[in-house]
């Protein structure tokens, strides 16, 4: 009898331990899966959101299913928003000239060599090989993170920026691209103070801070020789005009604009209007190929129809539209088309 009672008590105790274990496990699991834990009972002030461990994977799956290439509301390079844009855009062509795409197609080589006079014959590949011993010669935009939204401001030099008050908005972008002279000191309220990329050719080049990428737009082989010289020996002082013999820029941030990309813009986008696209067009399409969102400032005439730079008053400023080198009217049309296709946002200024 005593043995039976002992067995009965042990069985009941075992059952109670088992039930308590189940209750503890269930309560712990339930708390872990609650979307919020109100910690007011602890300190009376905070409400803490608890995120399940699988939440990141779930979000990733939804993003992949959405088909978007970035985390922006609209991703510039994604197809489907505009048939016109999709028929022109080629996301496979790199805007940067590197070791990997050093060999130009024959038609590109011929076209590029005719842009400006070549006073002496040079082997382009040999020149590039030597240049890429000084600068990286790599494409820093090869890999894109679909979980990020790379917002870019393309800042032109139009007088319509004066009094615009765009400075703070411009500075809020990830990439801020400027071209040629583009001073910021004294104009910060309208054009911003930050720059991440500055596009120049030898005749417009200036020294840059260490955190800015210098993007050389080459029109001839001599331009490649010049940048190599300006970052080393300083021997070249003249092209078709005086140039800086030495250039203070971060060598690790020097990039070379790809002539094949240059011709792609001329063929597909500006459609041979003008001899070749303007620097503004080159920068804009560079941004369209490396950014997820592109906002454009300082392009076109001001509200009075004047074409001039924001840092100067020039009564002859509209004369460049008549040179035949660039077709400003057609380029303005392309910008309008890109805006209508929701690929860029244009800020017209004053």
From Swiss-Prot:
Q: Where on this protein are sugars attached?
A: 211
Expression sites (tissue/organ): Highly expressed in skeletal muscle and heart and to a much lesser extent in brain, placenta, liver and pancreas. Scarcely detectable in lung and kidney.
User: What are the entry keywords?
Assistant: Disulfide bond, Glycoprotein, Glycosyltransferase, Golgi apparatus, Lipid metabolism, Membrane, Secreted, Signal-anchor, Transferase, Transmembrane, Transmembrane helix
The record's Gene Ontology biological-process terms are: ganglioside biosynthetic process via lactosylceramide; globoside biosynthetic process via lactosylceramide; glycolipid biosynthetic process; glycoprotein biosynthetic process; glycosphingolipid biosynthetic process; keratan sulfate proteoglycan biosynthetic process; lipid glycosylation; O-glycan processing
Q: State its location(s).
A: Golgi apparatus, Golgi stack membrane; Secreted
* PTM notes: The soluble form derives from the membrane form by proteolytic processing. N-glycosylated; necessary for proper exit from endoplasmic reticulum and trafficking to the Golgi apparatus.
Q: Which InterPro entries match?
A: Beta-gal_alpha2-3_sialyltrans, Glyco_trans_29, GT29-like_sf, Sialyl_trans
Membrane topology label: Single-pass type II membrane protein
Superkingdom of source? Eukaryota
Point out the signal peptide segment: none
The question of whether Acyltransferase is a record keyword is answered with no
Enzyme Commission designation: 2.4.3.4, 2.4.3.2
Which ranges does the record mark as transmembrane? 7-27
In this UniProt entry, which residues form the Cytoplasmic topological domain(s)?
1-6
Q: Which reaction does it catalyse?
A: a beta-D-galactosyl-(1->3)-N-acetyl-alpha-D-galactosaminyl derivative + CMP-N-acetyl-beta-neuraminate = an N-acetyl-alpha-neuraminyl-(2->3)-beta-D-galactosyl-(1->3)-N-acetyl-alpha-D-galactosaminyl derivative + CMP + H(+); a ganglioside GM1 + CMP-N-acetyl-beta-neuraminate = a ganglioside GD1a + CMP + H(+); a ganglioside GM1 (d18:1(4E)) + CMP-N-acetyl-beta-neuraminate = a ganglioside GD1a (d18:1(4E)) + CMP + H(+); ganglioside GM1 (d18:1(4E)/18:0) + CMP-N-acetyl-beta-neuraminate = ganglioside GD1a (18:1(4E)/18:0) + CMP + H(+)
Lumenal topological domain residue ranges: 28-350
Q: Name one GO molecular function term.
A: protein homodimerization activity
What broad class of enzyme is this? transferase
Task: List residues binding substrate.
Answer: 116, 157, 180, 240, 276, 280, 300, 309, 326
Q: In which pathway does it act?
A: Protein modification; protein glycosylation; Glycolipid biosynthesis
UniProt keyword annotation of Transmembrane present:
yes
A GO CC annotation given for this chain: membrane
State its role. Answer: A beta-galactoside alpha2-3 sialyltransferase primarily involved in terminal sialylation of ganglio and globo series glycolipids. Catalyzes the transfer of sialic acid (N-acetyl-neuraminic acid; Neu5Ac) from the nucleotide sugar donor CMP-Neu5Ac onto acceptor Galbeta-(1->3)-GalNAc-terminated glycoconjugates through an alpha2-3 linkage. Sialylates GM1/GM1a, GA1/asialo-GM1 and GD1b gangliosides to form GD1a, GM1b and GT1b, respectively.
On subunit structure and binding partners, the annotation says: Homodimer; disulfide-linked. Homodimer formation occurs in the endoplasmic reticulum.
**What's the family?**
Belongs to the glycosyltransferase 29 family.
**What is the name of the protein in this document?**
CMP-N-acetylneuraminate-beta-galactosamide-alpha-2,3-sialyltransferase 2
């Amino acid at each position: 009898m005593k043995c039976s009672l002992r067995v009965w008590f042990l069985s009941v105790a075992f059952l109670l331990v088992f039930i308590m274990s189940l209750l503890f496990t269930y309560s712990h699991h339930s708390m872990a899966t609650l979307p919020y834990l109100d910690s007011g009972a602890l300190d009376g002030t905070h409400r803490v959101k608890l995120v399940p461990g699988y939440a990141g994977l779930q979000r990733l799956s939804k993003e992949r299913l959405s088909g978007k290439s970035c985390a922006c509301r609209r991703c510039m390079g994604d197809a489907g928003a505009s048939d016109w844009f999709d028929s022109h855009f080629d996301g496979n062509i790199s805007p940067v000239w590197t070791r990997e795409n050093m060999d130009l197609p024959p038609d590109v080589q011929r076209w590029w060599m005719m842009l400006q006079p070549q006073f002496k014959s040079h082997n382009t590949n040999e020149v590039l090989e030597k240049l890429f011993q000084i600068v990286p010669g790599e494409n820093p935009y090869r890999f894109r993170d679909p979980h990020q939204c790379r917002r870019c401001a393309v800042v032109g030099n139009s007088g319509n920026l004066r009094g615009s008050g765009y400075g703070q908005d411009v500075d809020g972008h990830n990439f801020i691209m400027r071209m040629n002279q583009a001073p910021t000191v004294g104009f910060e309220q309208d054009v911003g103070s930050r720059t991440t990329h500055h596009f120049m050719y030898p005749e417009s080049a200036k020294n840059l801070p260490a955190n800015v990428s210098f993007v050389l737009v080459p029109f001839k082989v001599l331009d490649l020789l010049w940048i190599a010289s300006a970052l080393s020996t300083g021997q070249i002082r003249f092209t078709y005009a005086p140039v800086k013999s030495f250039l203070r820029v971060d060598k690790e941030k020097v990039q070379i604009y790809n002539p094949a990309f240059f011709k792609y813009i001329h063929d597909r986008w500006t459609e041979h209007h003008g001899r070749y696209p303007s620097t503004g067009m080159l920068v804009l399409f560079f941004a369209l190929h490396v950014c997820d969102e592109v906002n454009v400032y300082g392009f076109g005439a001001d509200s009075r129809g004047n074409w001039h730079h924001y840092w100067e008053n020039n009564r002859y400023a509209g004369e460049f539209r008549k040179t035949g080198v660039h077709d400003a009217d057609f380029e303005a049309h392309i910008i309008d088309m890109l805006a209508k296709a929701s690929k860029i946002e244009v800020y017209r200024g004053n």
